[in-house]
Regions:
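Acidic catalytic/metal-coordinating carboxylates
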Residues: 49, 75-78
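Active-site beta3 strand of CheY-like receiver
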Residues: 60-66, 71
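Short amphipathic alpha-helix used as the core "switch/output" element in two-component signaling
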Residues: 55, 77-89
Length: 143
């Protein structure tokens, strides 16, 4: 699902909006994140399953992925592994409502960019996305 209101307008400088992908099986969480990013220069696409998110990543160049760890079917940790094999530089911000030290360490070992525990502060999420986009810019310049 693409949020066309966000994708219809370019940034103030006239350039394309940065594409971000949000994957969470909870429609309210997806909408909350889309709304939190509405004032940012991002075009936000959404997916409700990891498989759908992976397919989108294979077709579209994203600047960051916001991913729930607990998803039906293919789980978040497995999805991170697949995504990293396809695009190792894509910054992944994970969210979970089932936090534990072991889960956080597994996510960090898989190569995530940022770890959020639900419920989280939306300002923290927005700051993490901004940092992820800057990180992506730096890694692209070095490549």
């Amino acid at each position: 699902m693409t949020h066309d209101a966000a994708s219809a307008s370019p940034t103030a400088a006239g350039s394309e909006r940065e594409r971000i992908l949000v994957c969470d099986d909870d429609p309210r969480m997806r909408e909350t994140i889309v709304e939190a990013l509405a004032q940012e220069p991002f075009e936000v696409d959404t997916a409700d399953r990891a498989v759908d998110a992976i397919q989108r990543i294979m077709r579209t160049s994203y600047r960051a992925l916001i991913l729930d760890l607990k998803l039906p079917g293919l789980g978040g940790l497995d999805a991170i592994s697949v995504v990293k094999r396809f695009d190792g530089a894509l910054p992944i911000i994970v969210m979970t409502g089932h936090a534990s030290y072991e889960v956080e360490q597994a996510a960090r070992a898989a190569g995530i960019f940022y770890y959020l525990v639900k419920p989280f502060n939306l300002d923290e999420l927005v700051a993490a996305v901004r940092a992820a986009v800057r990180f992506r810019d730096v890694t692209r310049r070095r490549a």
